[in-house]
Regions:
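Cys/His-rich short segments
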Residues: 20, 37-54, 75-103
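Flanking helices and flexible, charged tails adjoining ferredoxin-like Fe-S electron-transfer domains
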Residues: 1-18, 24, 28, 56-74, ...
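Hydrophobic alpha-helical scaffolding
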Residues: 29, 82, 149-150, 183-187, ...
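Ferredoxin-type iron-sulfur electron-transfer modules and their immediate structural context
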Residues: 1-49, 55, 59-73, 123-136, ...
Length: 306
């Protein structure tokens, strides 16, 4: 089992223009007995890998599934990180349950602001689109209505719920042909994020819905024809609609509030605690999710499977 210091050094190698890393939050650093390897499972490029070795000398049960009576595990997991293979998709960050890995350029707050702008442009729809799809559809969609990401696997459930709390009823994670994409593993991550978000929407009784699709919503289409005026959509959308603007101003404030609250939770207990343990913390995305749920109101007393 690698030492805590070894894990910290390995994760620090991930720090780049694409990713922010706080190794102290990694479950493998905080608990040597953890089996968490979500980042490695999500990574589509082989930048983060976990290999498992079974000791031939370690006693095993006949079915090979459990350690023998001594209770010791016969399997040793080894983490390996090759920063040169990082493609900056952000899927590992979306998979990380503790915020040990966080995306940059854009970070979550910038991405949420882009999504809020798209929400205003469409009047209730947020469409994220991967780089393959945006390249294929260039010129066919209004860029003000689409939030570009390298891979839709970078989107996590907290962002989807946050956008629903800001007024989005339709949230699309739009991708190209994932089978031919180097980020293909991101589609499964995106589908899981939508599944989790939709379970929350059902529990809270909201009409919002998130889905992975290969087509952008009709509201995102570019206005074609010789009479095209780049300001026409904005004019039609805002003319005489002060209430509409006020609602979206409130949504912007809600998004800013959620991220400010998440930032505040990170300023406490940064040092080692008196007991000698690492500081406890609320993962930023968890804080954002809690803020979004508060804005959505009370749940409909539905039990969620977690």
């Amino acid at each position: 089992m690698p030492s805590t210091q070894t894990y910290i050094e390995l994760f620090e190698r991930l720090r780049s223009v694409h990713l922010h890393v706080d190794a102290r939050r990694c479950l493998a650093v905080r608990n040597r007995n953890t089996t968490c390897n979500r980042c490695a499972n999500a990574c589509p490029s082989g930048c983060i890998t976990v290999t498992t070795r079974t000791s031939a000398n370690e006693p095993r049960e006949p079915d090979g599934a459990k350690p023998a009576e001594n209770g010791r595990s016969a399997e040793t997991a080894t983490l390996a990180i090759d920063p040169e293979r990082c493609i900056g998709c952000g899927t590992c960050a979306a998979a990380c349950p503790t915020g040990a890995i966080a995306p940059r350029k854009p970070d979550d707050r910038s991405l949420a602001r882009q999504a809020a702008a798209a929400l205003r442009a469409t009047g209730g729809i947020v469409a994220f689109a991967c780089e393959q799809l945006t390249a294929q559809a260039r010129g066919k969609y209004d860029p003000d209505t689409v939030v570009p990401v390298r891979c839709v696997g970078r989107i996590d459930a907290s962002l989807l719920v946050l956008m629903a709390s800001a007024g989005a009823l339709t949230i699309r994670l739009t991708c190209g042909n994932c089978d031919e994409c180097e980020y293909r593993a991101g589609k499964a991550a995106a589908e899981l994020a939508c599944q989790d978000a939709n379970a929350i929407f059902d529990a809270w009784g909201t009409r919002a819905r998130a889905s992975v699709t290969r087509k952008l919503p009709a509201a995102c289409r570019a206005i074609a024809g010789p009479a095209y005026d780049p300001d026409r959509r904005a004019f039609l959308r805002t003319a005489g609609d002060a209430a509409h603007d006020a609602a979206h101003d409130a949504a912007d404030l809600a998004i800013d509030r959620a991220f400010e609250h998440a930032s505040d939770t990170q300023r406490t207990r940064r040092a080692v605690m008196e007991t000698g343990t690492l500081p406890r913390f609320l993962p930023p995305r968890r804080a954002i999710l809690l803020d979004a749920l508060e804005r959505l109101g009370e749940p409909d007393h539905v039990v969620l499977n977690t």
